[in-house]
Amino acid sequence: MTEHETRRRFIGATGALMIAALAGCTGDGDDEGGSDGMDNESMDDEGGSDGMDDGSMDDESMDDESMDDKSMEHGATTFTVRIENVSSTDFYGADTATGGQIWITPGAYAVHTGENPLYTEGEAASVGMEALAEAGPPTGFDGEPGLVDELDGAMQVVSSGAYTPANTVADPNDPMEAVPGAPPIAPGGAFEFDIEAEPEQRLSFASMFVPSNDLFLSPDAEGIALFDDGTPVEGDVTGSVVLLDAGTEPNGQPGVGPDQAPAQDAPDQGADEGGVVRRLEAVDDGFEYPAVDATVQVTLTPQ
């Protein structure tokens, strides 16, 4: 599946300020004939009885059938993924670049096996992740590959794409260039997009946290489980999401620093930090940030 085969929708907040095969054992009809000889032989050789043998065989067959049915009960499932900005409208001061709000930019997603393919804690961010974390666009800086490009064809990535305004209808009051490359969602806004996945596959995504120099929201290293013992997961999965520092620019005071989206004059204008991706909780920059579950809510709805 490519990004062009995946439906994405943007749900703007009403009144929100937006500055930006069935498988199983069927049997073969041997229950009625020829079984006496097998049972008698079993009795002679093993000292068992017809009832015990039949029961054991039936129980084992039923167990096998149940396991087969359970493992094959769900094939590919379509999920609607909703990423909602649940932050307060005045977390930062009204005189900050976002008017006190926290914004979440459009981003890139991947359905994958194995670990989250968008980043690795303790390693340098990719070129595409740097662009997203510093300025918001999942399509990258001009002339450089974006995160969407990096995910396309990557090992263990089953499908990938971007949830961007190019495929949506944005709020008419939303300034389209609030974050270079793509507008963000303000408190109360949400993105929705559909993915298709099979058991053992997981979901990861990344969106920039605004205002910041290079912070982003993404699931942890494992990604978000889409199935629980073969059953599609439904409901709130925000507990798998973390706030990370890309390590590409030094952090400034949120909403005040001149090298941050949306205040910066151009993307990638801040100094290079040369660091590695870390959870924000491990970065002692002295600034205040909201808890993840007070910033974003991520839900899954299987179709």
Model-assigned labels for residue ranges:
Residues 196-201, 227-231:
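A short, structured loop/turn motif at beta-sheet edges
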Residues 184-185:
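Short proline/glycine- and polar residue-rich coil/turn motifs
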Residues 198-212:
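Short, surface-exposed ligand- or partner-binding patches at beta-edge/loop junctions that are enriched
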Residues 1-80, 84-91, 95-176, 180, ...:
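Terminal disorder- and signal-encoded targeting elements
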Residues 210, 219-232:
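Extracytoplasmic/secretory-pathway segments with low complexity and glycosylation-like composition
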Residues 189-193:
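Short strand-edge motifs at loop-to-beta-strand transitions and within beta-strands
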